[in-house]
Amino acid sequence: MPILGPISATEARYRQRDEMRESNLGAIRRREILTIAANTPELVRQRIERLHADPDFVLSLKHNGVAFDPQGPGRCPQQFPRALERVLATNDLMGMRFFEQGLRVSRAVGRIHIRDSGGGTLGYGTGFLVSSRLLLTNQHVLPSAAAASRSTVEFNYQENASGAIQASTMVSLAPQELFLSDEQLDYALVAVAPEPGLAACGWLPLIEDQGKLLVGETVNIIQHPNGEPKQLAIRNNQVVDELELFIHYQTDTDPGSSGSPVFNDQWEVVALHHSGVPKRNPANELLTTDGRVWQEWMGEQRIAWLANEGVRVSRLVRHIRAQALPPAAEPLRQELLGATPPPLARAPATNLVGPPAAGEGLTVAAGTATYTIPLQLNVSVSLGGAAGTVAGVAGDPQQELLGLFVRQPASASAPTAAAAVPAAFRL
């Protein structure tokens, strides 16, 4: 099985963009990502609005050359939410809600068992639910309906807080109900059998709207590298270029696994990971992270990568929408294109800090995955407050919890998006 995907085509695209990418990297180093050519004024405005900030206020600060002190007191967080500080690289602090939401998102990500006609395992890939009955992965993972019919997807294959593997759920694929794929976009969309346990996984909407990501932001990947228990690469892949169909993101340590969802910091899916640009020696052989010549038995997670490539979600949705389907499959597609994920039940909390004082405590959702966190990440936790919850939904008639996201009331000036993370700042 070609576990590495279309590397040659990815490498060619990457080399063709050397000059543009170096220009982008220069702007990123100077913390001037709003000047990057791919970040057009309209896209920047859409991104700012999606973060529930005031675009006129933010852009006026940019034009006036005002610097920010994100630790200072004072201005309205609606004008400059902390999420936007991270976009502009002025604040790397992440609230604990970010990790709780990441755990809940991860439920929809599964390990694909790729099997031969005799039932033997050929390899593994990653896939994720994009509706209650549809799974998205790479075409090089499931190249045909016949291959999909032999394969299965396993959810909840991950370690718990004590390091033990949790009980997982194996689900059959149902390509006879729906199977779509495309070689250029390297995606396969396949129906899954209607198992009762799927409801607990939820699903991740494919949002066609613009404004989910700017060049210069970091992205997060949830994956099963080489078939291993579920892992998260958090904020250690930086988007360095945007093409018509793809985005390129660089990392020093974290590869992506074929078929993995790529997320922004609001846990919206922005790309389908499918390939990368590996390091090579003078003989054009692939190298491992410790400098050896790579062999396929080592698994793709051992390759030393220069960059990763993901297929843009907006292009995937556009292609899926345009394909001819038999009438019986149309309801499945319409759920993907238009339905909203139902609210996910919170998993039972686990006490991590010993017996708390009355009214105090710290909880996280059960079902812990492995985090891959860069050393620069600083997390500040206060144990003096109430147990953590998803912000801003209980008792608030103006907000609605949908899957992982808090949906704000629609308005003419701002699109629906993940709830803002408030933060004070000072001019």
Task: Show which residues each predicted segment covers.
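C-terminal cap/linker of serine protease catalytic domains
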Residues: M1-A12, Q16, M20-N24, E195-A199, ...
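Serine endopeptidase catalytic core focused on the charge-relay Asp
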Residues: A83-S117, T121-Y124, F128-S132, L136-Q250, ...
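N-terminal accessory interaction module
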Residues: V364-P397, L404-R407
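Residues in intrinsically disordered, low-complexity segments of regulatory proteins
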Residues: A67, Q79, G202, Q266, ...
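Protease-domain processing segments flanking chymotrypsin-fold serine proteases, especially trypsin-like
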Residues: M1-G125, G338, P342-P356, E360-G361, ...
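Low-complexity, proline/glycine-enriched flexible segments
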Residues: V153, G256, E360-A366, F425
